[in-house]
Amino acid sequence: MPDGVRGHNVARPITHIFILLMLGLMPPYAHSLAAPLGKQAPQPMPADSAPVVEEQILSTTDKITKPVDTDAEAMRHNDLGVAFVFKGDLGQAIDEFKHALRLQANYFAAHLNLANTLLDIGKHDDAIAEFKAALRLKPDDLKAHNDLGVALKEMGDLGGAIAEFKTVLRHRPSDVNAHNNLGVTLKGMGDLDGALAEYRTAASLQPNDINAHFNLGLALMEKGNPDAAIAEFRTALHLRPDDAKIRLNLGNALAGTGQRMEAAQELRQYLRLELDTPANRRWLEQAEAKLRELEMPQ
């Protein structure tokens, strides 16, 4: 599970970019809840500190909006942009969305698609401008509000991000991803109790939401309640058994409660599942060191 919420972080990840598509497909994410584009790389931790993986901000809805406008040529270029997003050619996708907007400046879907694609490549200022352009056309669009919140959070404007997520929740109180996103942002402001409340709400609304349980586990660890955190990590792991980051955090939580054999087992699974990339090297090294410690005779 990547560190961060849009999509994925979140959500984000999206490093990994999760692009949720209204077409019903889910291509790989390049942000999220690892460090997402536009985020600073995590600072080194003391050798005896358990690594903590940051939450992922997710998108409220699908990352690419189906065109609803009638201009056939603008729609064609928007569709091409969506196709290039699927292909992973974000530069060409951006060109197509811009072409659509040259043909039809008030094309809401193209503004929103362009905004999210710019955010995926780390062009936060340009992305925010496009989100705001989309909202001028459709001020009540909740997806645009949520995704603007994600962009603002990644830019460090936590207050602005919270305002956007709360706008979503005023109109749609049952939005699980908006609760997760708000929780992540509140945690970033130091409001751990507020974050816990949002994660618990998300988990109660959607018991099978992996990010809600994972984020709740992380917050409970920070709150000093490892037993409850372990329960949340186990729930998340049941939903996604091959998620390396869940196993890493579960292993560290188990080690912290003296469950050495179980902790070692989870860390071995993490090392088996995690990709050996520069972004993951820090976590891999710390997991290897912790596993050696756990395997030493008492």
Positions of the model-derived regions?
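Ankyrin-repeat and related helical/solenoid repeat scaffolds used for protein-protein interactions
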Residues: 214-276
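Long, contiguous interaction/recruitment modules in multidomain scaffold/adaptor proteins
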Residues: 2-5, 11-70
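Conserved alpha-helical positions within TPR/SEL1-like repeat arrays
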Residues: 75-86, 109-120, 143-154, 177-188, ...
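Structural signature of tandem alpha-helical TPR/SEL1-like repeats
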Residues: 54-59, 87-99, 109, 120-133, ...
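Terminal, low-structured helical/coil segments at or just beyond the last alpha-helical repeat
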Residues: 36-65, 256, 260-298
